[in-house]
Amino acid sequence: MTDNFADLRRQWDDLAEQVRHHRDAYYNHTPEISDAEFDQLFRQLQQLEQEHPELAVPESPTLRVGAPVEQSSFDNVEHLERMLSLDNVFDAAELDDWLQRTPSATYLTELKIDGLSIDLVYRSGRLERAATRGDGRVGEDVTANAKVIEDIPHRLQHSDAYPVPELVEIRGEVFIAVEDFALVNEQRQKEGGKPFANPRNAAAGSLRQKDTEAVRKRRLKMICHGIGASEGFEADTQFDAYKALEAWGLPVSPYTKRVHSAQEVQERVTYWAQHRHDATHEMDGLVIKIDSFAEQRALGSTARAPRWAIAYKYPPEEVTTKLLDIQVGVGRTGRVTPFAVMDPVFVAGSTVEMATLHNQTEVKRKGVLIGDTVVIRKAGEVIPEVLGPVVEKRDGSEREFIFPTLCPACGTRLAPQKEDDADWRCPNSQSCPAQLSSRLTYLAGRGAFDIEALGEKGAEDLIASGVLIDEAQLFNLTEDDLKRTKVYTTKAGALNATGEKLLANLESAKHTDLWRVLVALSIRHVGPTAARALAVRYRSLEALRAADVEDIANTEGVGAIIAQSFAQWFDVPWHRNIVEVWADAGVTMADSEADIPDQVLEGLTIVVTGSLVDFSRDSAKEAIVSRGGKASGSVSKKTSYVVVGENAGSKETKARDLGLRILNEDEFKQLLANGTV
């Protein structure tokens, strides 16, 4: 029994970590797998929790909405009312099951726009604030950028039929229309930028631009799909609310339709499956809502989604095209990945000409030959996937792909990292230009140093011109260094505006949080979550390096694999040199005492269960860990306190049975402030 539970727990941990990783990647606009593959992982985790409820913990990703808000130049703001997600169904039988569980006289069907969620607050008819979804409770303040989107009025229009309320919080989706997407990419390439992979990435990246003039040029649009908090507004149905939004001058979807039976709902699903490219924007499903607000209130919500709405997700689209060649790319960690070069083909809202093939084992398994007609699919992900060949279309001219033995970027002999590893890597990690370029763009990202002027082309130019041989000298770059490049100089050879911006960015990046420095080092498995935990516990890189592997592994949220990876990274001399040179250049390697809360919870184990008003699961955990406490997912005799929110469930019952101290949210805040209640 115990061994079986341990196996199940390991299975849950693995699935949960994959879901967390890929969800964070999606919301940070760097997806690594398709939407369909993510949905499959998510459902496997849900099913495991349903079959074994003892595995579920409050911080499970199945209970989360969105992703944590990363620290950035945008201020964090709390939504007046939580922005929930939607549960999904994937076939007619699942939808019919939902319809039987939630019968209603009237449903509203609307397209699921593949864009970026936004929350608008109007007070006395004036736009007061605009924010991204974030984790559903806290988002980023993007008011300045929202004000340059033509679809978002600065002031609501007067309406006799629907008087403008004193306060109204409006939910919508920001997107780029399909026909505008090509124009945006064309302009971006003229300016020397890399084209966006799809309209969603373009919209998400644009809304988080620091330059409002750049946002204005991106042709962003918005459609409203709901109302959050309000004062002085009443409506009986969702449909009436949409009429009010329209009367106030806000855009609503022209594709929304009221239907009055389960059969009509299924008919709408079938219709849009056949006409998904008729919409002016990308869509990946149909949302079905109960129209009556009274019925919505009666059904309520789970921790992550309303019970009165569901999203029907369409399967990935599949098309055929010609496989012209198979080439390989080298990533940040040296992994060599084959990819397909194809005749351009339009699929799922954009034209694609490259698709992933993962590794040489996958190429053989799929049986594709250069020259084949191949089936590809794409469901909103950055790079589509080759499914396999259309064998009956072969004419004998096709040829087998031979995986290279040498790195295409530096000529080093390739090898698997370990025996039987499907992935082959270039071991020349320090000097391989492809790996260095990827590391430079990674450390320049928003989740690390946030060096806006260091993009892919800039990184490649710094390497090709001989200015950088590895990342160690990055913070020692001078104006004379940049004058040796093309990206950062004028035709006359003087430093251009981008070059000046890079020097300013680098100076600013020296004074950043320790966790961002840890992420920037490209240590395998060390992402923002682990980096934050290590920074909170050790406070300085010196203290972290002095700790042994076992001690690091005992850090909440870290574990043995990350600890071992950290130790192995510092075993490499040129890795240590990076840290030393950065420190000499003035990069902060420790968090100041002022940034670190008093360790008032040291030695305490705290369990948080149920939904809190002012804390998400992650922010409650971070509040505990940052004060020296241990945030646990299970209740035991060793638990010091159990913090109980709404819908707490079995953990509260167990805590009472064990006679543990139970705190409400106000008492939890007191505990965080003083260490006692």
Curated annotation (Swiss-Prot):
Domain BRCT: 596-677
Single annotated GO MF: DNA ligase (NAD+) activity
Single biological process term from Gene Ontology: DNA replication
E.C. no: 6.5.1.2
Pfam families the record matches: BRCT (PF00533), DNA_ligase_aden (PF01653), DNA_ligase_OB (PF03120), DNA_ligase_ZBD (PF03119), HHH_2 (PF12826)
The protein's enzyme class: ligase
GO cellular component: cytosol
Matches recorded under Gene3D superfamilies: 5' to 3' exonuclease, C-terminal subdomain, 6.20.10.30, BRCT domain, DNA ligase/mRNA capping enzyme, Helix hairpin bin, Nucleic acid-binding proteins
Catalytic activity: NAD(+) + (deoxyribonucleotide)n-3'-hydroxyl + 5'-phospho-(deoxyribonucleotide)m = (deoxyribonucleotide)n+m + AMP + beta-nicotinamide D-nucleotide
Residues holding NAD(+): D35, A36, E37, F38, D39, S85, L86, E110, R133, E173, K289, K313
InterPro entries for this protein: BRCT_dom, BRCT_dom_sf, DisA/LigA_HHH, DNA_ligase, DNA_ligase_AS, DNA_ligase_CS, DNAligase_adenylation, DNAligase_N
Record has Protease as a keyword: no
Region feature (Disordered): 189-210
Positions of the catalytic residues: K112 (n6-amp-lysine intermediate)
Disulfide bonds: none
SUPFAM superfamilies: BRCT domain, DNA ligase/mRNA capping enzyme, catalytic domain, Nucleic acid-binding proteins, RuvA domain 2-like
Cofactors that this protein relies on: Mg(2+); Mn(2+)
Coiled coil: none
Keywords associated with the record: DNA damage, DNA repair, DNA replication, Ligase, Magnesium, Manganese, Metal-binding, NAD, Zinc
UniProt binding sites for Zn(2+): C407, C410, C426, C432
Entry function: DNA ligase that catalyzes the formation of phosphodiester linkages between 5'-phosphoryl and 3'-hydroxyl groups in double-stranded DNA using NAD as a coenzyme and as the energy source for the reaction. It is essential for DNA replication and repair of damaged DNA.
PANTHER family for this protein: CHROMOSOME TRANSMISSION FIDELITY FACTOR 18 (PTHR23389), DNA LIGASE (PTHR23389:SF9)
Family, as annotated: Belongs to the NAD-dependent DNA ligase family. LigA subfamily.
Protein name: DNA ligase
Name of the gene this protein is made from: ligA
